[in-house]
């Protein structure tokens, strides 16, 4: 089964909790705080594996959660950081944030890595909070929650040559005649519903050819599963445009040529500049010669290779022409990269989160914001000292003043995430 797009959930591991502990050895007078820090949570890391060819495994496992860090211990022992969760993906995988639609990573080379969800940092133990005014604090932090999000994974096949054209123009027949690939071939449209790959061996050189499902008018807008098919064209170095010059289905070959190129350009403007070889197929049929003459009159500057994929006439010459053209093209097509391929691990800079905002939910004041909600999750509210520290942090952030301006009075309910408490003047 060929699967080229899936939606999955990823979550970095939570950081370990910091510890509250004090030294009590016999010969260590006034030993002081000795609670260790929690360990770093594991990252979810995607790594390219050339042995994979499809995203089918992700249809059955759609949740990836990295392990959390160890908790801090006594005697200032820090918890161990968790191991990363390594997920292997096929080359050509693009990872997109489902919320923002931002491209997180573009994974193309064997061994290339990208951090998709970062693990949370470990919480600090009480020895981190000791100072001259509070030499024996009973304060520690919970571990920071790991980053979590839904992502869309898209697989764009990496092939040297992509065969494009209307349905039933002979692309699959051509691929099967020059490679060991066995695509389904039948006398009806959309016989090919998934891309087929084959290797063309020319002796001293070879290249990978992809038979892409047929395109129709409106493909750039998704008509006829156009988006699913067109994404695979983006990574090909050379486009081989196959035309049914015999017009078996009654279409005009020249209009077919214009329409397919229009769809490619509308889907991705960069495809307009991608090298292209035009192939007139089905030349064994009687109508083909006259149609080819008319085509050349309308497009005199377009070099056309005449073949019959069914009888193999002209096919060998076409393959050598493709090989010669590939020799003049860079190994990688011009695609929009998220990061340089040489960069083995990709981290994306995070913008500073908004501090907070306050809304009303009936009689409840709801304080929300990434920064304030993270502060709640990392505060050990079972500790009186930690709760007092949290109250001071809220005041310093301006939450108390903002609540008063909105009319909060003593005893009103305030909610931050899952925490509810009474407002105190």
Swiss-Prot record:
- List UniProt keywords, sorted A-Z: ATP-binding, Cytoplasm, GTP-binding, Hydrolase, Magnesium, Metal-binding, Nucleotide-binding
Give positions of region: Disordered. Answer: 118-144
In this chain the OBG-type G domain maps to 159-327
Q: Which stretches are annotated as coiled coil? A: none
Its cellular-component GO annotations read: cytoplasm
Q: Which domain of life is it from?
A: Bacteria
Question: Where is this protein found?
Answer: Cytoplasm
User: Cross-referenced InterPro entries, in alphabetical order?
Assistant: G_OBG, GTP-bd, GTP-bd_Obg/CgtA, GTP-bd_prot_GTP1/OBG_C_sf, GTP1-OBG_CS, GTP1_OBG_dom, GTP1_OBG_dom_sf, OBG_GTPase
The UniProt record lists the keyword Membrane = no
Residues reported in the UniProt entry to bind ATP:
165-172, 190-194, 211-214, 281-284, 308-310
Q: Where is the OCT domain?
A: 348-425
- CDD domains (alphabetical): Obg
Q: Which cofactor does it need?
A: Mg(2+)
An individual GO BP term: ribosome biogenesis
What does the entry list as the binding residues for Mg(2+)? 172, 192
**UniProt-listed Enzyme Commission number(s):** 3.6.5.-
Any idea where the Obg domain is?
1-158
An annotated Gene Ontology molecular function: GTPase activity
The entry's family comment says: Belongs to the TRAFAC class OBG-HflX-like GTPase superfamily. OBG GTPase family.
Q: How does it assemble?
A: Monomer.
- Function noted in UniProt: An essential GTPase which binds GTP, GDP and possibly (p)ppGpp with moderate affinity, with high nucleotide exchange rates and a fairly low GTP hydrolysis rate. Plays a role in control of the cell cycle, stress response, ribosome biogenesis and in those bacteria that undergo differentiation, in morphogenesis control.
UniProt-listed PANTHER family: DEVELOPMENTALLY REGULATED GTP-BINDING PROTEIN-RELATED, MITOCHONDRIAL RIBOSOME-ASSOCIATED GTPASE 2
Protein name per its UniProtKB record: GTPase Obg
- According to its UniProt entry, this protein's organism is Brevibacillus brevis (strain 47 / JCM 6285 / NBRC 100599)
Output the lineage of the source organism: Bacteria, Bacillati, Bacillota, Bacilli, Bacillales
